[in-house]
């Protein structure tokens, strides 16, 4: 009875194609809900990160090496939102890939490249914040625009090379050809790689994450020591010198920036950890993860691209002010690029 029921309700991605994948659709109500949730994430990733990029590039007050890194990170998240999430949304909800094999490879390549680019950007931002907090007065001479440019280049080139190697050379499927052949069907876009490449993928997540955790642990330790030192010097001497006052203001500003970006790093780790663990389990235990669990892990990672602008809006008054100027159209006025965005 069960087999007859399954056969009667069996749906295919392409009804008239022999090698079509099996379609496992959700109920109409759940599909509408999922389209709303996933679509909202894509729109937020596109619009929010576009606002970040425009803010940094337009307002001269934001032209700094650290902010250029943030703008480049926002560019990667923007590309995830516009070129990855909409198509993944259809695949996740319809359980079929309707965009062809060629675009499947390109989409998968972009998916991996842009997401790992975000990880490397955050790693370099952690290095930037570490230098800024531990040595704020010397920081401008250490982390220059050229250094920022090198970090940005590495953050884009390495993920693009890695993802191209995975999806366009075929070496990632060596040793699992039978599995790839068994999973191959019309209307599918499965990413299957061997254990060696899964380990490389894990290291691409683990190493930057470990660097971030170590650096931010040191950052908050140093920040705490600085806060105690400043409080002691202020309470011990009412006639604080202008140099000490300047040091205190600079240190306070850098600590605040480090705190905000620390929240960004934490959001990245929480978002990406489920997907990373899931890929390891699948690679070494025979792809035992249910489809809905895998999709949840994927979208947890995707949604990270939409989180960063919300974090900036919550913690950065200058971003809220820049956002208002952009949305109101005031940036189209002359000399708007010289508008002061900081209260101090």
Swiss-Prot record:
GO molecular function: trace-amine receptor activity
Cysteines joined through disulfide linkages: 21-185, 96-189
Predominant place of localization: membrane
One Gene Ontology cellular component annotation held by this UniProt entry: plasma membrane
Topology of this chain in the membrane: Multi-pass membrane protein
Subcellular locations according to the entry: Cell membrane
SUPFAM superfamilies tied to this protein: Family A G protein-coupled receptor-like
Protein's UniProt keywords contain Cytoplasm: no
Keyword Phosphoprotein: no
PROSITE patterns the UniProt entry points to: G_PROTEIN_RECEP_F1_1, G_PROTEIN_RECEP_F1_2
Swiss-Prot/TrEMBL keywords: Cell membrane, Disulfide bond, G-protein coupled receptor, Glycoprotein, Membrane, Receptor, Transducer, Transmembrane, Transmembrane helix
Coiled-coil residue windows: none
Superkingdom of source: Eukaryota
One of the GO BP terms on file: G protein-coupled receptor signaling pathway
Residues passing through the membrane, by range: 37-57, 68-88, 103-127, 147-167, 197-217, 261-281, 296-319
Extracellular topological intervals: 1-36, 89-102, 168-196, 282-295
Residues listed as glycosylation sites in the UniProt record: 4, 18
Residue spans, topological domain Cytoplasmic: 58-67, 128-146, 218-260, 320-344
Cited function: Olfactory receptor activated by trace amines, such as N-methylpiperidine and N,N-dimethylcyclohexylamine. Trace amine compounds are enriched in animal body fluids and act on trace amine-associated receptors (TAARs) to elicit both intraspecific and interspecific innate behaviors. Ligand-binding causes a conformation change that triggers signaling via G(s)-class of G alpha proteins (GNAL or GNAS).
Family, per entry: Belongs to the G-protein coupled receptor 1 family.
Protein name: Trace amine-associated receptor 8c
Species this protein is from: Rattus norvegicus
Species classification: Eukaryota, Metazoa, Chordata, Craniata, Vertebrata
Gene from which the chain derives: Taar8c
């Amino acid at each position: 009875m069960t087999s007859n029921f399954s056969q009667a309700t069996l749906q295919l991605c392409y009804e008239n194609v022999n090698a079509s994948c099996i379609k496992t659709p959700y109920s109409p109500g759940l599909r509408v809900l999922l389209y709303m949730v996933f679509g909202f994430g894509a729109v937020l990733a596109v619009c929010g990160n576009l606002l970040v990029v425009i803010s940094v590039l337009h307002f001269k007050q934001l032209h700094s090496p650290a902010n250029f890194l943030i703008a480049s990170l926002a560019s990667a998240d923007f590309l995830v939102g516009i070129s990855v999430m909409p198509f993944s949304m259809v695949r996740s909800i319809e359980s079929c890939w309707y965009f062809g094999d060629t675009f499947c490879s390109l989409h998968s390549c972009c998916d991996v490249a842009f997401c790992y680019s975000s990880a490397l950007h955050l790693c370099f931002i952690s290095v930037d914040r570490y230098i800024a907090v531990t040595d704020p007065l010397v920081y401008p001479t250490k982390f220059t625009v050229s250094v920022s440019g090198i970090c940005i280049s590495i953050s884009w080139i390495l993920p693009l090379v890695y993802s191209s190697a995975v999806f366009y050379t075929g070496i990632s499927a060596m040793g699992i050809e039978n599995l790839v052949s068994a999973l191959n069907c019309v209307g599918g876009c499965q990413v299957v790689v061997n254990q060696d490449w899964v380990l490389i993928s894990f290291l691409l997540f683990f190493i930057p994450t470990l660097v971030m955790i170590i650096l931010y642990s040191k950052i908050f330790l140093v920040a705490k020591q600085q806060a105690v030192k400043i409080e002691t010097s202020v309470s011990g001497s009412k006639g604080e010198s202008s140099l000490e006052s300047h040091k205190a203001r600079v240190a306070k500003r850098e600590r605040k920036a480090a705190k905000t970006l620390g929240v960004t790093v934490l959001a990245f780790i929480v978002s990406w950890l489920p997907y990373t663990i899931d890929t390891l389990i699948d690679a070494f235990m025979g792809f035992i993860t249910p489809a809905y669990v895998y999709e949840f892990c994927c979208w947890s990672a995707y949604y990270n691209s939409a989180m960063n602008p919300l974090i900036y809006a919550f913690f950065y008054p200058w971003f809220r002010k820049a956002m208002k100027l952009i949305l109101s159209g005031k940036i189209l006025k002359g000399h708007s690029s010289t508008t002061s965005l900081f209260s101090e």
